[in-house]
Structures are given as structure tokens and as C-alpha cells.
């Protein structure tokens, strides 16, 4: 459930990843644009399977660059959270950040190496090494949830128990004053900026 910000503007928090579903219902396709008519023919089925496999392979290879960037953003945000919580210099925190960075670099290296070891197919397409591509994709997919967990851990659980934004601005019963007082963990950071980081 998305709650619109009422006091602290955060335009980037309103941007999300969008996937699409394309439905061809009662759609005319000119015959010269039909490439796989005759599914009962053995060669067509084999070609269709290979086409799907190569499409997935290309996607997995692109993943080694895409998810690396996501991991770098998570590492940066986790480092910011650690600074706001005044724990950035703790060895266990540095270890956690190093784990995220290490995974990102290994995934990127797998993608680069798979491109370096690519083969040119008769069609002219340069196809990345399958083993290295799959290794990078698996490493990224396996560790991304650990990275989210690390970031949540570094917040000290505040990301799960942060009061609604309105509470930080309530005047009755000093609710806002108390929320702003107890959210601060590092005296170098204001209550508002701490709130912004934790809400991010």
C-alpha cells in the first residue's frame, strides 16, 4: 500500500519499477509477419524452444550489469543508514557492506568475463559464455534478498516499526516532539534528515 507523503516531499519514493503484460486478443497479424506457422513440424518446435532459451540467456547476461547497479545503490543506502545510526565505523557493519560490494563486483566480473569469452554465431550475434552468465545471474539472484536484509538490519529494525509520517508532525500529547526526539541516533544528523533516511 502506497501512502502519499504529506509533510516531507520525496519525489523519488513515488517512482517504481513497472512490468507490462501484452495481450493480443482478436488481433490481425499479416501472414508475412508470421514466422512460426506449423507448430506440428518438429523443426519449428525445436527452433521455438531455442529462441526462448537464447532470449533467456541474453536476459541473464544483462542481469549481471543491471543487478550490480542495484547492489551498488543498496550498499550506498546501507552505508548512509549506518552513518545516521552512528554505527558506520563498527567492524561488523563494514563486513556487511563489504559483502554487498563483493557480490556486486563478482556478478559484474562474471558478466564481463562471459562477454569476453563470447562466441560469434552464424547469424552475426555475439553470444556470451553460458556457464559464466548463469553463475553471475545465480549469485545476484541468490544474494539480493540478503542485501535487503542487511539494509533492514542496519536500520536497527526502524524500517519495520517507523511510525506514520503524520505522527512526526502531531502537536497533541507531544507525539511529534517525542517521535523526533527518539528517532535521532547520531547527533550530527537532524531528526528530519534521520526520518528521511529511514523512510527511504
Show where each model-derived region lies.
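Short, charged, amphipathic alpha-helical segments
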Residues: 94-98, 126-134
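Active/binding-pocket-proximal capping segment
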Residues: 114-124, 161, 165-169
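Extended amphipathic alpha-helical segments enriched in small hydrophobics
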Residues: 62-121
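Alpha-helix capping/hinge segments and adjacent helical runs
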Residues: 131-200
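Short, well-ordered loop/turn and helix-capping segments at boundaries between secondary-structure elements
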Residues: 29-30, 103, 146, 153
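FAD-binding core of flavoproteins
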Residues: 1-66
Amino acid at each position: 500500500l502506497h501512502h502519499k507523503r504529506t509533510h516531507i516531499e520525496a519525489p523519488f519514493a513515488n517512482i517504481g519499477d513497472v512490468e507490462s503484460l501484452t495481450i493480443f486478443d482478436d488481433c490481425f497479424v499479416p501472414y508475412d509477419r508470421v514466422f512460426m506457422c506449423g507448430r506440428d513440424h518438429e523443426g519449428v518446435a525445436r527452433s521455438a524452444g531455442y529462441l526462448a532459451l537464447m532470449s533467456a540467456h541474453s536476459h541473464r547476461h544483462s542481469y549481471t550489469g543491471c543487478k550490480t547497479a542495484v547492489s551498488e545503490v543498496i550498499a550506498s543506502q546501507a552505508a548512509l543508514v549506518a552513518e545516521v545510526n552512528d554505527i558506520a565505523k563498527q567492524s561488523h557493519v563494514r563486513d556487511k557492506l563489504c559483502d554487498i560490494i563483493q557480490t556486486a563486483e563478482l556478478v559484474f566480473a562474471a558478466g564481463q568475463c562471459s562477454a569476453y569469452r563470447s562466441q560469434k554465431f552464424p547469424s552475426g550475434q555475439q553470444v556470451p559464455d553460458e556457464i559464466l552468465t548463469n553463475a553471475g545471474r545465480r549469485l545476484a539472484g541468490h544474494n539480493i534478498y540478503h542485501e535487503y536484509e542487511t539494509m533492514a538490519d542496519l536500520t536497527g529494525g526502524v524500517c519495520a516499526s517507523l511510525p506514520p509520517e503524520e505522527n512526526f508532525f502531531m502537536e497533541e500529547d507531544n507525539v511529534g516532539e517525542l517521535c523526533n526526539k527518539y528517532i535521532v541516533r547520531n547527533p550530527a544528523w537532524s531528526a528530519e534528515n534521520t526520518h528521511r533516511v529511514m523512510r527511504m
